């Protein structure tokens, strides 16, 4: 079972309640589309939230004898896991992930990696731009200068996809998992005129590999909405906030 939800911003009650109510007839892969809020204060607050989540998934196992993994896409209001000493890199589902030994079921999917889970193929493109970064800096709120993927990181991601495409390596029916949407898709859901490198590079991904991408799932916008796009790219866009959507 693959389930998607949106930003948590440190409030774990919604996701814990979902895990507790789930009957657990099959393994659960629970995707959080950014800003989970567990790598935010980088201290005791984060630790308590991680303990709550890990406890919930362990109780899920004890009750159902089925596994529950919380798969996290990086947002723009959280520290990169690779910059936190307690995370180690592992290979899962065909791609690289970041995991802490204390919380083995809280798994950050590395940006730019391809994953195959229960027959579906995913491309992960995390991060985003904080339009409120100046006020966040002034008020000593969480802001990270590497919230967006760098130009070099984007070049590497696009290069890897080009290589796979040229070699015909099963780059079909991709579902992109992200925090924000490409510029061409975001304008349908928001009136914000300011754009970012992330949104523009995502548009480049669509232009180059749109024929391989069947759907794009995101968070960030604090709405639950879906739409079939048809203008420049024909595919399905879903935005998650406080819902739980099962694939």
Task: Label the predicted regions.
Residues 1-3:
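Extreme N-terminal starter segment of soluble prokaryotic enzymes
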Residues 5, 10-117, 190-203, 208-209, ...:
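Core catalytic region of metal-dependent phosphoesterases/phosphodiesterases
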Residues 8-9, 36-37, 76-80, 128-129, ...:
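Catalytic metal-binding/acid-base residues of hydrolase active sites
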Residues 13, 41, 81, 125, ...:
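Generic hydrophobic alpha-helical membrane-span motif
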Residues 28-30, 173-174, 214:
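Conserved acidic residues
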Residues 69, 105-107, 121, 215, ...:
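Conserved beta-strand segments of alpha/beta enzyme cores
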Residues 95-98, 117-196:
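Active-site-proximal loop/helix segment associated with metal-binding centers of metalloenzymes
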Residues 116-118, 204-211, 222-247:
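Binuclear metal-dependent phosphoesterase catalytic core
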């Amino acid at each position: 079972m693959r389930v998607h939800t949106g930003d948590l911003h440190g409030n774990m009650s919604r996701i814990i309640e979902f895990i507790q109510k789930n009957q657990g007839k099959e393994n659960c892969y629970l995707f959080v589309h950014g800003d989970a809020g567990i790598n935010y204060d980088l201290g005791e607050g984060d630790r308590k939230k991680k303990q709550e989540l890990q406890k919930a998934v362990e109780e899920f196992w004890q009750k159902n004898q089925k596994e529950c993994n919380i798969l996290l896409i990086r947002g723009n209001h959280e520290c990169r896991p690779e910059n936190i000493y307690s995370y180690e890199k592992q290979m899962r589902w065909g791609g690289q992930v970041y995991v802490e030994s204390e919380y083995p079921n809280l798994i950050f999917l590395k940006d730019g990696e391809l994953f195959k889970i229960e027959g579906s193929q995913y491309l992960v493109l995390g991060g985003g731009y904080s339009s409120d970064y100046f006020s966040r800096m002034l008020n000593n709120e969480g802001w990270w200068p590497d919230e967006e993927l760098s130009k070099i990181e984007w070049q590497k991601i696009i290069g890897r996809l080009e290589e796979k495409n040229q070699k015909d390596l099963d780059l079909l029916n991709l579902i992109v998992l992200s925090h924000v949407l490409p510029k061409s898709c975001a304008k349908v859901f928001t009136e914000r005129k300011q754009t970012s490198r992330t949104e523009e590079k995502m548009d480049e991904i669509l232009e180059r590999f749109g024929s391989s991408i069947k759907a794009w799932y995101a968070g960030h916008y604090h709405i639950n909405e879906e739409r079939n796009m048809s203008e420049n790219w024909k595919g399905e866009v879903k935005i998650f906030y406080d819902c739980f959507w099962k694939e």
